[in-house]
Amino acid sequence: TYNNNLIR
């Protein structure tokens, strides 16, 4: 996945 902050 990409940046975890974007997923949240």
Curated annotation (Swiss-Prot):
It comes from the Eukaryota. It catalyses: Hydrolysis of (1->3)-beta-D-glucosidic linkages in (1->3)-beta-D-glucans. It is an enzyme of class 3 (hydrolase). The keyword Secreted applies. Its EC number is 3.2.1.39. Keywords: Cell wall, Glycosidase, Hydrolase, Secreted. Belongs to the glycosyl hydrolase 17 family. It is found in: Secreted, Cell wall. This is Glucan endo-1,3-beta-glucosidase. One of its GO terms (molecular function) is glucan endo-1,3-beta-D-glucosidase activity. GO terms for cellular component: extracellular region.
